[in-house]
Curated annotation (Swiss-Prot):
This is Phosphoribosylaminoimidazole-succinocarboxamide synthase. Gene3D superfamilies: ATP-grasp fold, B domain, Phosphorylase Kinase, domain 1. One of its GO terms (biological process) is cobalamin biosynthetic process. GO terms for molecular function: ATP binding; phosphoribosylaminoimidazolesuccinocarboxamide synthase activity. It comes from Ruegeria pomeroyi (strain ATCC 700808 / DSM 15171 / DSS-3) (Silicibacter pomeroyi).
């Protein structure tokens, strides 16, 4: 097999040059990190589950007219995505107080917010992805005002879709993080959902019990991460309900 050209390796994924112009192969690793990679481990099967779940969410978004970079899943660990220019922001949508918001504002975890709150962080691991305002974004030219209007609209549409989907299977969407890519169609820029949507990037709590079904299981040593992610996948029908917790590792 021809050796592929690695473009970038992050904490949870590796990007390779795609087989067709304008495409990238996104490989999901089993590495788990927390607290800006201060805590690390390898969790067998995590990459397989995140690949399948991200495919499921991205496909669902495309079906309701939300543009994404996803093209198709290639195998158990890889998907083909559209190459795009990443906007240097993490976009966070919060429905309930948790994590850094609870610490920052002194709001008890689990408190429902008056409305979905959208926050922005600068993508910079060395600085710990600091929270920034729209004033910072405009002043430093990280995104235009039109971009910000489009990003807000995309983020809230993703929230509507994911919230309803999760509620239907007994899961509360506490918050989530997305990344935005810029593509050019006939020289006209367009913003799309990029990166991934998975339990790595969402806070998901069981509505009935409050059990955490996301990366907080790893952050806070609450049990098996693959068990939690598999439970989400089973409820959504992404893997069979009778399947054992660890997926068979193929490819």
């Amino acid at each position: 097999m021809a050796r592929r050209t690695k473009i970038y390796e992050g904490k949870a994924k590796i990007l390779y040059e795609g087989p067709e112009p304008g495409t990238i192969v996104q490989y999901f690793k089993d590495d788990a990190t927390a607290f800006n990679a201060q805590k690390k481990d390898v969790i067998e099967g995590k990459g397989v589950l995140n690949n399948r779940l991200s495919e499921y969410f991205m496909t669902g978004l495309a079906q309701i007219g939300v543009p994404t970079h996803f093209i198709r899943r290639l195998n158990m660990r890889e998907q083909l995505v559209r190459a795009c220019e990443i906007v240097p922001l993490e976009v966070i949508v919060r429905n309930f107080a948790a994590g850094t918001m609870s610490k920052r504002l002194g709001i008890e975890e689990g408190t429902q917010l008056p409305r979905p709150i959208v926050e922005y962080c600068l993508k910079n691991d060395e600085l710990g992805d600091p929270l920034v305002t729209e004033e910072h974004i405009a002043a430093f030219g990280w995104a235009s005002q039109q971009d910000m209007d489009d990003i807000l609209s995309l983020a809230l549409r993703v929230n509507d879709y994911l919230s309803g989907l999760m509620y239907g299977v007994g899961i509360k969407l506490v918050d989530f993080k997305i990344e935005i890519g810029r593509v050019y169609e006939n020289d006209y820029p367009r913003l799309i959902i990029a990166d991934e949507i998975s339990p790595d990037s969402c806070r998901l709590w069981d509505i009935a019990t409050g059990q955490k079904l996301d990366k907080d299981v790893f952050r806070r040593d609450l049990g098996s991460l693959t068990d939690a992610y598999s439970e989400v996948a089973r409820r959504l029908g992404v893997i069979p309900k009778t399947q054992i917790a660890k997926p068979t590792l193929i490819n």
